[in-house]
Structure formats: C-alpha cells, structure tokens
Amino acid sequence: MSKYQFKVEVLPRFLMAQSAPDQGLFVFAYTIKITNVGSVTAQLISRTWNVNDANGHTEKVKGLGVVGQQPLLKPGDAFEYTSGTRLRTPTGTMHGTFFCVAEDGEKFDTDVPMFVLDALSAGDARTLH
C-alpha cells in the first residue's frame, strides 16, 4: 500500500422529482466517501470530472475542493459529501481525479474510476479504488 492513498466510494442516485424526462433533463445525485488509507495526512485540493451522456456528449468540470471544502484527512479519516449532475439522456457515466497534497509536500492524484448514472437502476453502492 502506498503511503499516499485515498479510497473512494460512490453511491449514485437518480432524482426523479428534479428531472423532466420528457424535456431531456435527468438529474442525478452522487455521494462520495473519501478515506485516507495511506500513512500520511493529506489534503484534497481540487477535482476534475468527466461527465458523459449516452449521446456521446462530454462535459469536463474542474474546480477547487469539493462542495466548497478542501478536506484535510489524517490516516484513517474519511470525508463524505453529496453533489449532483444533469444529463440529457437517462444514462451516462462519470469518472475523475482528485488532486491531493500530503503534509510532507508530496503531490498525488486519486483516480475515481468510471461509475454509471442510470435513471432506472441508480442507487447501488460501488466501491472504487
């Protein structure tokens, strides 16, 4: 195990009440849990997301922190947040990267492998490393 390592768990959900399928609007929430499974305290600085719909449209989203925060995680600490995205189709995917800096100055990326956004079956937990 690397001394610089975060584990990422994702739980996507379709939000029917905020969606308008007949107008091509499908809204999803996703809860992300980030756990520092390394041996060094590290801070999440920024994120990059690639959001893809079933028509091949890709939106790249970059920003500082997550939900307005840049959590500092000691070994064993976890941070959980919920955010959302909109698609033009009932299915799509997301994947991304968290850029992190450890307390010793080491910079590292934590990949968030692709997860599925599906208006019919969103809600199954996925553990991603």
State each model region's role:
Residues L25-T31:
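Short, solvent-exposed loop/turn segments enriched in Ser/Thr/Gly
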Residues R86-H129:
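Terminal connector regions
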Residues V40-E59, C100:
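Short acidic, flexible loop segments centered on an aromatic residue
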Residues M1-L25:
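Low-complexity, acidic Ser/Thr/Pro/Gly-rich terminal tails and inter-domain linkers that flank the onset
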Residues E59-T91:
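Intrinsically disordered, low-complexity Pro/Gly/Ser/Thr-rich segments with frequent PxxP/GP/PP motifs
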Residues D53-G56, G68-A78, L117-T127:
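Short, surface-exposed linear segments at secondary-structure transitions and domain or protein termini
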Residues F6, A42, E59, E106-T110:
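Short beta-strand segments
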Residues I34-G38:
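Asparagine-centered strand-capping/turn motif at beta-strand->loop junctions
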